[in-house]
C-alpha cells in the first residue's frame, strides 16, 4: 500500500477562523452612535428605534443611549433609549 496519495489529492482543508458573532452590548448598557450592538448572520434580531442594520445584518446604534431588548410582532428587536 502506498503511503503517498495521488498527485491531485488534498489532506483535508484547514479549520477556518471563528467569525466572532453575537451580542456585543447587552440590555441596559450605554452606547454611543455607531457602536455595534450585535453581529449576526441573518436577522435573528431586528432593528428597533434608533438602531440601524448593516449590509451583513450587523445591528448598530444610530444615537447615544442605552440598549433595550424586546419583541414586536413576534420578532426579537433591539432598540436604543436615548439619554436624557
Swiss-Prot record:
Q: Where is this region: Disordered?
A: 1-23
Q: Name one Pfam family in it.
A: Ribosomal_L27
Task: Point out the signal peptide segment.
Answer: none
GO MF annotation list? structural constituent of ribosome
Keyword list (alphabetical) reads: Ribonucleoprotein, Ribosomal protein
Q: Give the superkingdom in one word.
A: Bacteria
GO biological-process terms attached to the record: translation
The entry's cellular-component GO terms read: cytosolic large ribosomal subunit
Q: Which HAMAP family match?
A: Ribosomal_bL27 (MF_00539)
Stated name of the protein: Large ribosomal subunit protein bL27
Identify the coding gene: rpmA
Amino acid at each position: 500500500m502506498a503511503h503517498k496519495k495521488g498527485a491531485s489529492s488534498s489532506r483535508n482543508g484547514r479549520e477556518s477562523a471563528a467569525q466572532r458573532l453575537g451580542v456585543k452590548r447587552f440590555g441596559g448598557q450605554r452606547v454611543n452612535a455607531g457602536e455595534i450592538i450585535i453581529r449576526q448572520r441573518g436577522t435573528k434580531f431586528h432593528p428597533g428605534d434608533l438602531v440601524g442594520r448593516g449590509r451583513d445584518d450587523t445591528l448598530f446604534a444610530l444615537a447615544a443611549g442605552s440598549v433595550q431588548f424586546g419583541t414586536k410582532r413576534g420578532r426579537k428587536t433591539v432598540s436604543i433609549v436615548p439619554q436624557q
